[in-house]
């Protein structure tokens, strides 16, 4: 903004705050816009991009200072700018709220900057998403999944807690197994991205269930090999992800190379992988960038697990009161722990 008219116009259209860029405003212009905003009970985000502007913001008494990570000359971004400037703001204006702006796309970036900033201004990366609610969850909490959903009420509990994905287990021997109709009813409980869990199923059966229910991903929990995965890929609707689960005992398993969107590592106890309630040695994870972490996750260890940098956590038995019965208090506690950074 460069003119007080814009402030009044913004308020007319329902804005609660304005962003004032010290890179384009001198002190006199800033004060005029500040006065107009305050007369309308509007907040002000004062944007700085270098040390000089930072000192001006402090001298002007800015209460909320945004650090723009974008170079306005060539439009490149550098998140280290927040790390470089925030300590000076803390020193000179300890009561100011620090906001990191621009170039923020992932939850890991948010976690990395959390010790420097009190909040984040995120625009294009969120607005490009079809589902804004789930997009915000992904960047603030990570792409976490609550598996073993068997009832619409449990889907609602998972969604309310902060989950992005909901897991539906189509494995008959599982204590949390669902059939097609119960899966459909469960999905009616909340607008999660639903993942179907299968184990050595016929490819055509998997594709049929996925297509009919509109699932977002397939999680393979059996001995499915690369040939199986390649065939399944050709049968699934475009955009449906394939996740491969691996049991981890005392060594990291070999991961399939092609057509896998996410690798899920779960604790293996004897011949059983998944649903054991056990935690494996997390030092075996390796590169976490494509990993969903499962196995014995609960409110007690969710915060520590979230620090590992995985794509997301897969919660199940640790947030239940009984197999297939999700506990609202445990879910809320687990996601509070994840959010504690």
Across the structure, where does each feature detected by a protein language model lie?
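Active-site beta-loop-alpha junctions enriched in small/polar residues
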Residues: 1, 23, 49-51, 70-72, ...
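N-terminal active-site wall of soluble small-molecule enzyme domains
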Residues: 1-45, 53, 82-85, 167-235
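Catalytic cores of alpha/beta
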Residues: 2-13, 49-60, 100-122, 150-161, ...
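Ordered, small/hydrophobic-rich secondary-structure cores
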Residues: 4, 21, 29-128, 281, ...
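Glycine-rich phosphate-binding active-site loops on the catalytic face of alpha/beta enzymes
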Residues: 6-29, 66-76, 116-139, 163-175, ...
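Hydrophobic faces of well-ordered beta-strands that scaffold small-molecule active sites
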Residues: 18-20, 44-46, 65-67, 98-101, ...
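Glycine/Thr-rich beta-alpha phosphate-binding loop at enzyme active sites
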Residues: 57-90, 167-174, 248, 258-292, ...
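C-terminal helical cap(s) of enzyme catalytic domains, especially alpha/beta-barrels
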Residues: 79-88, 114, 126-147, 180-189, ...
